[in-house]
């Protein structure tokens, strides 16, 4: 399996090639979409992309953790975490891609 990472530039280049917008407009479109998604997540909203998946923010409560080296109990503060749940279609596509 290759270790390729898709970047913003890759996404805007794909929009440029496949949609036909200028490179500048393609980059602006990608930035705008990512900004809208980020803003919604900061507000605690879910971002659902059909046939792809759902991004959401979960609140995790405070708890007591343990230092694995010393065994000492350590308090873990409450926090918000970002989660992604892929759609069934995305799960199937990824699983089918693994069959070589």
Curated annotation (Swiss-Prot):
Signal peptide: none annotated. GO terms for cellular component: cytosol. Keywords: DNA recombination, DNA-binding, Transcription, Transcription regulation, Translation regulation. It comes from the Bacteria. This is Integration host factor subunit alpha. Belongs to the bacterial histone-like protein family. Heterodimer of an alpha and a beta chain. It comes from Ruegeria sp. (strain TM1040) (Silicibacter sp.). One of its GO terms (biological process) is positive regulation of metabolic process. This protein is one of the two subunits of integration host factor, a specific DNA-binding protein that functions in genetic recombination as well as in transcriptional and translational control. The lineage of its organism: Bacteria, Pseudomonadati, Pseudomonadota, Alphaproteobacteria, Rhodobacterales. CDD domains: IHF_A. One of its GO terms (molecular function) is DNA binding. Pfam families: Bac_DNA_binding.
């Amino acid at each position: 399996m290759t270790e390729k990472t898709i970047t913003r530039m890759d996404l805007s280049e794909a929009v440029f090639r496949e949609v036909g917008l200028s490179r500048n407009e393609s980059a602006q479109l990608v930035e705008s979409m990512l900004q809208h998604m980020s803003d919604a997540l900061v507000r605690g909203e879910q971002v659902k992309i059909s046939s792809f998946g759902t991004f959401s923010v979960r609140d995790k409560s405070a708890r007591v953790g343990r230092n694995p080296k010393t065994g000492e109990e350590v308090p873990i503060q409450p926090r918000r975490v970002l989660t992604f749940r892929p759609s069934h279609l995305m799960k199937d596509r990824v699983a089918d891609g693994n069959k070589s």
